[in-house]
UniProtKB/Swiss-Prot annotation:
Enzyme class: oxidoreductase
Catalytic activity: 2 oxidized [2Fe-2S]-[protein] + NADPH = 2 reduced [2Fe-2S]-[protein] + NADP(+) + H(+)
Location of the protein in the cell: Cytoplasm; Mitochondrion
Flavodoxin-like domain mapped to chain residues: 16-160
Name under which the protein is recorded: NADPH-dependent diflavin oxidoreductase 1
GO biological process terms on file: iron-sulfur cluster assembly
Amino acid sequence: MTSIRTSNCASEGRRLTILYMTQTGTSSDLALRISRQAQRKRFHVTIADVCSYDPTDLVSESLMLFLVSTTGQGEFPTTSRPFWNFLLRKGIPEDILEDVTFAAFGLGDSTYPRFCWPVRLLSRRLRGLGAKELVEHGEGDDMHYLGLEGELGPWMNRFWRKLDELCPLEAGVREVGRDELLPPSVTVTKVETEEGRLKEKHDGRDALGRHLEDQGWSISILDKNQRMTATDHFQDVRLLEFVRLNQTDVEEDKRQIGENEEISRGSASALDGISIQTYRPGDILCLHPINDAASVTEMLSRLDLDADTLVSLAGSTIPSTVPQSPAHMSVRDLLTHHLDFTSVPTNSFFEQIRLFSPTGSQEREKLDEYCGIFPEEELAKGANPQDGIDEMYEYAQRPRRTIKEVLDEFKSVQVPLAYIADVLPWIKPREFSIASAPPANSEREKRVSEEPHAIQLSVAMVKYKTRLRKARTGLCTRWLSSLPLGSRVPVVIKPGYLTLPPAQAPLILIGPGTGCAPLRSLVIDRLSNSTLARSEIHLFLGFRYRTKDYLFQHDWQHLQQSYANQFHLHTAFSRDGEAKTYVQDLIVKPDNAHVLWEAITERNAWIVVAGASGKMPEQVRGAFESIARSQGGMDEEQAKRFMDALERQRRWQEECWG
């Protein structure tokens, strides 16, 4: 196993810039994986999130790869929109990027109507500015049985083939072999000083929280963690309530931090509590889960790492939630707060760990096969690399084995500390739609409350059995379940994807299951605000049982009684009777269909669908197409075009999640 310096990996003139647009971190992980492949081909590689990239630098680039995630209804990730808006500016010369060659790969979910639209738009716009497309853009589909890999693998083969033709290696220069170890993308440095150990001991109480404060997060208090579903119901859905720190807590924090310690703060300080002025219906609260102590101890033992060793991290691809040098932390804190070993391993994980298993061992041979690597003699006999990749899918991804379980089974794999942050993925913040409404009766920018304002979430706990019959609990679920009331929890509010309807527009809202959460925020905000409560609201909710999982039941019934002339509640319970009834069945009932059609065509109603992605949004859309046919006299094609027009006007919106 040979280690190669980055400077020795690249040939002069071979430069590739990889820009990624991400919402949850998937495209940034993919950027790292592709950068390693590019380094083996002797490219100088630069990786950047477009939110930190100056778009005026595009004219200086020669070869670029864009990795584009899809959010909302076929939209660019939130942090990528300034970059996209820059490209749309009027007056940009049509040949300004004539010296740029690019390729683009999109990440999306084909159950959405606007599957991978951002990558299509970006590709077209870059060509419109004179850039040359190396290979037709690719579209990775989460719904493929192999996930994104179903399209990524074949597309990357085409990409590298074209790139090799465009930029052939110089005579006598070879690619870096697949069995040679590249330098890590994240530098992990041991901190040996006694001063460092003392500082670690001082900061250890809440180092993560303080760092997140510097990044714009706030510290909240968990005030409620209450089960909403019946104890005998299969799904545990929790009502979580977070409130800002009171003044006593603020003063205590100031005292513990120290009057002379200078601390930089982000846009929302923890000492100010949750900034209630900054959110509106449809917005998102982010939580940062951590690993439990017992699991961390097991992982430390498996990796044979000293928990108390202090390290500092450095690298351009480290997420903002992770402190970099000169800040440092113990290895235990690194595994507790930042590295995820409970997730399902990706192809990239196997590509990494195979290099840390002894060459010639049975485990190394199996790991090679999982990566589609076979000896020449096996290939000559007809071995198919895709068969090995499919076998990896059946071993790891289909039964949802965790990274820890894979490492426990492949005992020969010994990952050194220097590579630990390359092999294990980062813990990603979890996003939840806010279920509570901001203080009403004032404009958003004037919403200020002297009393602590509670932000509420409706969160389904992730607990299931794998195909191997193993009980599995999600990382965030395990963390939330262990939090006692009164815990200090870092949070940050992000803008949602909904375009809020105008005050005079009627609302038609569809929210099965936990999809009712963002709709609750919207409904309460509309009804409790005298300047907004002008038009009718039709709310369609779907649950299994009236007595077991009817979320926010008393709230809906109270609103129905208090606003009987405006608020119209329709509920479907799919398991209460012999015939299963779903929200789409209620929508097409003749009486409802007539009222809804009038609201849409005569009063410009807006429709919002919230909940799980997959078949539900498609079936609900089909129900409205059915109304267009039955009430509007349209044929099938006209009904589809009618719904497409509503979507273009933002009068049809989906707030759905996987």
